[in-house]
């Protein structure tokens, strides 16, 4: 969503006239360091496709690609891999071109960034389409989300697979903040508001720093909280042949997930969970 003045990014804290850690930080770098793990994500997508289709995928389309960090990881994996990143935010794509694509060497010729609407993108069919980090939750109506899923279906080769993720659990319905400390900053996930009737939710990401400065509203998301049954039903209605949910295992030494995702028919009623979903054409 476009940030309104109420939700616009602001730099806070620090003494007047002095540079702060927040003023010198890059929100995209902070996001990639705290939210993304493109290596593990591509490991899962690549391995799962090969298990399901008994071949190596080559063509990948990353919807809502942002900085195209994931697309860049894809073209680094194999010399025949190609990636297409689709996003409406041209400024973020330009950041990705400068900080990621330009550093790829020869692989930069195998990545294409499209400044287009994912609902209308028209390009060659691909093996894989990705919609990660819950980005598709921007579509709040069933008909619109089904339309998006159908456009993905039509954009895949005959044995193509659509990969997406989702989160839930009792904490997902709460207005709450969760802080995660890193070496030189703290990531703050802010579920600012939730409407249980419509499912509308407003989520934000903030970053704070040891010098007391802060980036408020570094990122803002105006979403609908979709449930797994709804997502599965809409994928099947859009034409996909089989939909599989991959549940994350538990780390024996902590209450956190272990990063290993396996196919599951039933899940645990945890306070918070994240899953991958595959939808096979």
Describe each PLM feature range.
Residues 56-66:
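Conserved class I S-adenosyl-L-methionine
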Residues 67-80:
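Conserved SAM-binding loop of SAM-dependent methyltransferases across substrates and taxa
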Residues 96-97:
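Conserved SAM-binding loop
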Residues 104-118:
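Conserved SAM-binding strand-loop segment of SAM-dependent methyltransferases
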Residues 119-129:
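A short acidic, Gly/Pro-enriched loop at the edge of an enzyme's catalytic core
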Residues 144-158:
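A short glycine-rich, Lys/Arg-flanked "PGG" loop and its adjoining helix->strand segment in the class I
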Residues 163-234:
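SAM-dependent methyltransferase
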Residues 225-281:
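C-terminal lobe and adjacent flexible extensions of AdoMet/dcAdoMet transferase-like proteins
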């Amino acid at each position: 969503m476009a940030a309104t003045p109420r939700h616009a990014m602001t730099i806070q804290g620090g003494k007047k006239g002095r540079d702060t850690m927040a003023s010198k930080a890059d929100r995209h770098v902070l996001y990639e360091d705290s939210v993304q793990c493109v290596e593990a994500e591509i490991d899962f997508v690549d391995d799962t496709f090969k298990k399901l289709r008994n071949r190596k995928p080559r063509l990948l389309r990353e919807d809502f690609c942002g900085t195209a960090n994931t697309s860049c990881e894809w073209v680094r994996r194999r010399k025949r891999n190609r990636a297409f990143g689709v996003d409406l935010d041209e400024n973020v794509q330009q950041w990705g071109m400068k900080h990621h694509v330009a550093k790829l060497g020869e692989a930069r010729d195998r990545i294409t960034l499209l400044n287009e609407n994912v609902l209308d993108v028209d390009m060659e069919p691909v093996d894989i389409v990705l919609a990660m980090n819950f980005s598709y939750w921007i579509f709040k109506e069933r008909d619109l989300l089904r339309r998006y899923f159908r456009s993905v279906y039509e954009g895949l080769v005959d044995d193509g697979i659509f990969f997406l993720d989702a989160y839930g659990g009792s904490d997902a319905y709460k207005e709450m903040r969760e802080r995660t400390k890193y070496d030189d900053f703290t990531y703050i996930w802010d579920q600012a508001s939730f409407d249980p009737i419509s499912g509308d939710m407003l989520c934000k990401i903030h970053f704070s720093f040891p010098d007391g400065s802060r980036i408020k509203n570094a990122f803002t998301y105006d979403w609908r909280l979709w449930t797994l049954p709804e997502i599965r039903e809409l994928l099947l209605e859009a034409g996909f042949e089989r939909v599989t949910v991959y549940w994350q295992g538990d780390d024996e030494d902590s209450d956190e997930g272990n990063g290993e995702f396996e196919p599951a028919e039933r899940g645990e009623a945890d306070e918070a969970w994240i899953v991958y979903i595959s939808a096979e054409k």
